[in-house]
């Protein structure tokens, strides 16, 4: 195997691994990311579980915080942003 063939093999391998990894981060219908998707045994539908945003993380839509509330706080740049309590 010469250098060009080895490079092409590595490129294909990286592409395949990237595609597999991208499937784990399927966007849900509310703009967030589902932690995992599983096939429901009744009806064969895919059910995505929602994930709450931990304390101190940005909450741009004022929803999905684990604590249930989101307030404006100053970030490291001095800008005011919404963060989960």
From Swiss-Prot:
Q: A biological process (GO) annotation for this entry? A: defense response
Any GO MF annotation of the entry: calcium channel inhibitor activity
Q: Which UniProt keywords apply?
A: Calcium channel impairing toxin, Cleavage on pair of basic residues, Disulfide bond, Ion channel impairing toxin, Knottin, Neurotoxin, Secreted, Signal, Toxin, Voltage-gated calcium channel impairing toxin, Voltage-gated sodium channel impairing toxin
User: What tissues is it present in?
Assistant: Expressed by the venom gland.
For the site labelled Critical for insecticidal activity, the residues are 58, 75, 83
Q: Which GO terms describe its cellular component?
A: extracellular region
Cystine crosslinks: 52-66, 59-70, 65-84
Superkingdom of origin organism? Eukaryota
Localization terms from the record = Secreted
| PROSITE patterns from the UniProt entry | OMEGA_ACTX_1 (PS60016)
Q: Which residues form the propeptide?
A: 23-48
Extent of the signal sequence? 1-22
Q: Could you share any additional remarks the record makes about this protein?
A: This toxin comes from a female specimen. It is observed that propeptide sequences coming from female specimen have only limited homology with the male paralogs, but the reason is unknown. Negative results: does not inhibit potassium channel currents. Has no activity in vertebrate smooth and skeletal nerve-muscle preparations.
Question: What's this chain's function?
Answer: Insecticidal toxin that reversibly and voltage-independently blocks both mid-low- (M-LVA) and high-voltage-activated (HVA) calcium channels (Cav) in cockroach DUM neurons. Also causes a modest block of insect sodium channel currents (Nav). Induces potent excitatory symptoms, followed by flaccid paralysis leading to death in house crickets.
Recorded family membership:
Belongs to the neurotoxin 08 (Shiva) family. 01 (omega toxin) subfamily.
What is recorded about the domains? The presence of a 'disulfide through disulfide knot' structurally defines this protein as a knottin.
Task: Please identify the protein, giving its name as recorded.
Answer: Omega-hexatoxin-Ar1a
Originating species: Atrax robustus
């Amino acid at each position: 195997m010469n250098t060009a063939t080895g490079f092409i093999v590595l490129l294909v391998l990286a592409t395949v691994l990237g595609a597999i990894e991208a499937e784990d981060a399927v966007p849900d219908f509310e703009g967030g990311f589902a932690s995992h998707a599983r096939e429901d045994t009744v009806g064969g539908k895919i059910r995505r579980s929602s994930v709450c945003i931990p304390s101190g993380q940005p909450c741009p839509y004022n929803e999905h915080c684990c604590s249930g509330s989101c307030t404006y706080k100053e970030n490291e740049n001095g800008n005011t942003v919404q963060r989960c309590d």
